[in-house]
Design a protein with these regions (language model features):
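Low-complexity, intrinsically disordered terminal/linker segments enriched in charged
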Residues: 154-196
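Sec/Tat signal peptide C-region and signal peptidase I cleavage site
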Residues: 18-24
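Short beta-strand edge/turn micro-motifs at domain boundaries
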Residues: 136-165
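Surface-exposed, polar/charged faces of alpha-helical domains
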Residues: 40, 47-50, 79-83, 109, ...
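Surface-exposed, charged secondary-structure patches
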Residues: 97-137, 189-196
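Bacterial N-terminal signal peptides
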Residues: 8-17
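Bacterial N-terminal signal peptides that target proteins for export
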Residues: 1-9
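Early exported N-terminus immediately downstream of N-terminal targeting peptides
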Residues: 26-100
Length: 196
């Protein structure tokens, strides 16, 4: 059984390959089409910088990093000023996107299998499997309708929520230092281009 870090890394292609759908497409159709597009980018002839930019655009178009940030922060945003909250959202977005888009290119484009789609009102769950030469990883998306599009509000890798995984890290950072200390760490990582 691979370690959680390896599982999260291997799943990043599925994370990075999503974008805002056309109005007529459901969550599963969107997921399938954009995963294929992400593989095209990774397997394409562009250089690393061009691929990073293209994958970053896909993430910006689909991933609801503010919703992910709220889940990851938990109660730590309570009582914070608007400026602090907005900075946290911005830093989280930049850190999350940079981390997963950069790590994406560590892997050859994998194959995907598609499971079930469940739509309840304005939310949906889409099940997929990331298939690499040596492993298979279940990656389930939680999506929310936003106007005519669908955006991912959480991603579960082998049943582990990425947002809750970040929350555990942030809880530890705040307990050790403070919320301002957490912001300082995020500023440093984003400023240094650190995707680790």
């Amino acid at each position: 059984m691979p370690g959680r870090g390896a599982v999260l890394l291997a799943a990043t292609l599925a994370v990075a390959g999503l974008q805002a759908p056309a109005a007529a497409e459901g969550p599963m159709a969107v997921t399938r089409s954009v995963l294929e597009r992400s593989n095209t980018i990774v397997r394409g002839s562009g250089d690393r910088k061009q691929k990073l930019a293209a994958l970053n655009d896909l993430l910006n178009g689909f991933l609801d990093t503010e919703a992910l940030a709220k889940l990851a922060a938990g109660s730590h945003l309570e009582g914070r000023s608007q400026a602090e909250t907005e900075e946290f959202y911005r830093l989280f977005h930049d850190f999350f996107v940079r981390t997963y888009v950069q790590r994406l290119l560590l892997f050859d484009a994998p194959d995907f299998a598609y499971g079930t789609e469940t739509i309840t009102g304005d939310t949906a769950k889409v099940g997929t499997t990331v298939i690499t030469p040596g492993d298979r990883f279940a990656v389930d998306y939680t999506l929310r309708r936003a106007g005519d599009s669908w955006r991912a509000t959480d991603i579960l890798v082998e049943g582990v929520s990425l947002a809750r995984n970040f929350r555990a890290q942030f809880d530890a950072a705040v307990a050790k230092d403070s919320f301002q200390g957490l912001l300082d760490r995020l500023r440093a990582k984003v400023g240094a281009g650190d995707g680790s």
